Design a protein with these regions (language model features):
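Flexible glycan-contacting loops in extracellular carbohydrate-active proteins
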Residues: 135-165
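Beta-rich interaction/scaffold domains
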Residues: 191-295
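Extracellular glycan-interaction surfaces
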Residues: 1-21, 41-51, 70-139
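Short structured motifs
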Residues: 23-28, 91-97, 153-156
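Extended recognition patches within non-cytosolic domains
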Residues: 4-5, 168-196
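Aromatic-rich beta-strand patches that line glycan-recognition/binding surfaces
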Residues: 41, 51-68, 125, 153, ...
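Extracellular/lumenal carbohydrate-interaction signature centered on repeated Trp-anchored short motifs
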Residues: 28-40, 97-107, 142-143, 159-165
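Predominantly extracellular/luminal cell-surface or secreted proteins
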Residues: 65, 83-87, 126-128, 153, ...
Length: 295
């Protein structure tokens, strides 16, 4: 699929196929994954299948297979499977959850694999800037495997595919640091979902300002409730929003903006910046029970 925004991406829209078609094969998988360390990075948007919606564990974004051992990296139900299959073919006996992975939205992943001191492989997973899961011992070594195969959107041994979109798939020959994995996935997510990230930032800023105001009140800090006349200002400050009611109005407006699905990234970030400025510029009164304007 050629997308006007993201250029060329892989889109899988077929949810079931018994001819071993409609998925992608990662070429040179032996060289890419048959080593003591690597990092697989990818942007993935999981989409709901058209039918067979209960077959969640049989659908994986990436499968790295070596004989009977497999890594199922990101199933439809937000898990990572490892080792041999369990009682159901194509579903790992061992799994960990990555938490809630949004369906229909871009998410950024880093799968960091490393074998230490000759031991079995360990896998750490980062999602959207946060460490989401860790497997200390997957039970086998990819560096000793000689028959590695890897697929996108299909588990080995099943006919179910993980419908969705896949972009920016990169395999690095090293296990990147925790900081690098977090930063990379955070940056990828923001690039794909700028308004979503900006909305989350504004929500956090609203909560931060309200918490700060409550702390100030608990500490006996009193903010001005009346605006100064223009002649009472020193310097060119006439019209500056520096009272508590004005900040409360700005917080209410920010609440409305956050709830507006049409709000732009620029508007959301501008509102967050404005709240910071208004809180920093609040005028305090010199005494709790005085109406004398402070400066």
């Amino acid at each position: 699929l050629t997308d006007d925004t993201w250029n060329t991406i892989l889109k899988v829209s077929t949810q079931w196929n018994n001819k071993n078609d409609y998925h992608a094969t990662i070429t040179d998988a032996q060289n890419l994954f048959g080593r003591t360390q690597f990092t697989l990075l990818a942007d993935v948007m999981i989409e709901e299948p058209s039918s067979d919606k209960t077959k969640t564990a049989m659908r994986s974004a990436f499968t790295i297979s070596t004989g009977s051992n497999r890594l199922h990296l990101l199933t439809y139900d937000g898990k990572v499977g490892y080792g041999v299959d369990g009682s159901t073919k194509g579903v790992s006996k061992n799994e960990i959850s990555l938490g809630d992975i949004a369906i229909g939205e871009w998410n950024a992943f880093a799968f960091v694999y490393k074998e230490t001191d000759g031991g079995n492989g360990a896998l750490t997973i980062y999602v959207n800037g946060t460490k989401a899961g860790e497997i200390a011992d997957i039970g086998f070594k990819l560096s000793e495997a000689t028959d590695i195969a890897a697929t996108v959107a299909r588990n080995v041994g099943t006919n179910y595919l993980l419908t969705g979109q896949y972009d920016n798939i990169v395999v690095k020959p090293t296990a990147v640091s925790a900081r690098s994995a977090a930063n990379e996935t955070a940056a990828r997510r923001e690039a794909k979902n700028p308004s979503t990230v900006a909305r989350e930032e504004l929500l956090a800023k609203i909560a931060e300002i309200r918490a700060a105001l409550q702390t100030d009140a608990d500490n006996g800090i009193v903010y001005a409730t009346d605006k100064l006349e223009s002649w009472q200002y020193t310097g060119n400050k006439s019209g500056v929003a520096d009272t508590l009611p004005e900040l409360n109005d700005a917080l209410a407006a920010a609440d409305t903006l956050v709830a507006d699905d049409a709000a732009t990234t620029e508007d959301l970030r501008s509102a967050a910046s404005a709240l910071d400025s208004q809180y920093a510029g609040l005028r305090t009164l010199p005494e709790t029970n005085t109406s004398i304007p402070g400066t």
